[in-house]
């Protein structure tokens, strides 16, 4: 099987996993830039990475989207300034990631690697004892 076919299968598996975790079979998907937070009943996943070392980062994004669809609760729309809305969204993203990571333990590493890649940190540092 060619690497291209394997990458397509990984994408399909990620979308199936998102549907299963979120208990939402209606979720549609495409390949492209992820939206944070995602839109309702849709996920956009970046292309599967060519390098195995980047696979956990990629999985972290799909884990986040699954957790968003599982744990995010639609609240009443209330008026917020743009900076306040951005902070509110980031707090909600952190909340669903924490809830998901506590339920699905393997996803914590994936989400950590993805988050660190967003701020361009390649390896988590550990405090010395």
Where are the language model's segments positioned?
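Basic/hydrophobic alpha-helical interface regions
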Residues: 1-118, 122, 126
